[in-house]
Structure formats: C-alpha cells, structure tokens
Swiss-Prot record:
Keywords noted in UniProt: Ribonucleoprotein, Ribosomal protein, RNA-binding, rRNA-binding
Primary role: One of two assembly initiator proteins, it binds directly to the 5'-end of the 23S rRNA, where it nucleates assembly of the 50S subunit. One of the proteins that surrounds the polypeptide exit tunnel on the outside of the subunit.
Quaternary state and interactors: Part of the 50S ribosomal subunit.
CDD domains in the record: KOW_RPL26
UniProt GO molecular function: rRNA binding; structural constituent of ribosome
Protein name: Large ribosomal subunit protein uL24
Pfam families: KOW (PF00467), ribosomal_L24 (PF17136)
Protein family (similarity comment): Belongs to the universal ribosomal protein uL24 family.
Keyword Nucleotide-binding annotated: no
BP terms from Gene Ontology: translation
One GO location term (cellular component): ribosome
Length: 102
C-alpha cells in the first residue's frame, strides 16, 4: 500500500471528494484506510462500558485506498508515489517533487 498511518491525503472520489485529512488506520487485507473526518456514518451502538448510554453514534468508516491521493508534504499538492531503493532500503518518493516521503 502506498499510504501509511499519519500521511495527509485528499479524497479524490466519492461523497467526500475534495476533503483532506490524516490517515488514522489502515486495513491492509482489504486495501482500505480510515481518514480523519471523512466518510462519517451512523452506527447503532449497544450499551457497553465505553458507551454506557448506547444509541446512535457517528464513526469514521474505511474508504478504499484508490479513492485517496497522498499530499506532498513540501508542496501540499496531491502526488503519485514511486518506490526507490536507497542504501538498501525501499523508500517512497513523490513523483511530483522527487522528495523522499517520511
């Protein structure tokens, strides 16, 4: 997967198209990511220790990784990601600016 937890991304497709946020969780087996403040859905929660009241709560649901594009940290513009081998390690590189991504 070309994105990691903590990356800033922009949603490029779907109901939240154009929104930006930080990736809070990745679901690798299904190629999905949870982006902060994006794809908010209502969930009917049974009472539990965490939610003693229960009821309807808003949560961030995962979206497919193909619907997000990484933002280049130096220019804050959407960019594609390339992979290079540097000093024997595989690193992510921004195709737009050529900078190594954290």
């Amino acid at each position: 997967m070309f994105v990691k937890t903590g990356d800033k991304v922009r949603v490029i497709a779907g109901k939240d198209k154009g929104k930006e946020g930080t990736i809070t969780k990745t679901v690798a087996g299904k190629d999905r990511v949870v982006v902060e403040g994006v794809n908010i859905v209502k969930k009917h929660q049974k009472p539990s220790n965490e939610y003693p009241q229960g009821g309807v709560i808003d949560i961030e649901a995962p979206i497919h990784v193909s619907n997000v594009q990484l933002l280049d940290p130096s220019t804050n513009e959407p960019t594609k990601v390339a992979f290079k081998i540097e000093d024997g390690k595989k690193v992510r590189v921004s195709k737009k600016s050529g900078n190594v991504l954290g």
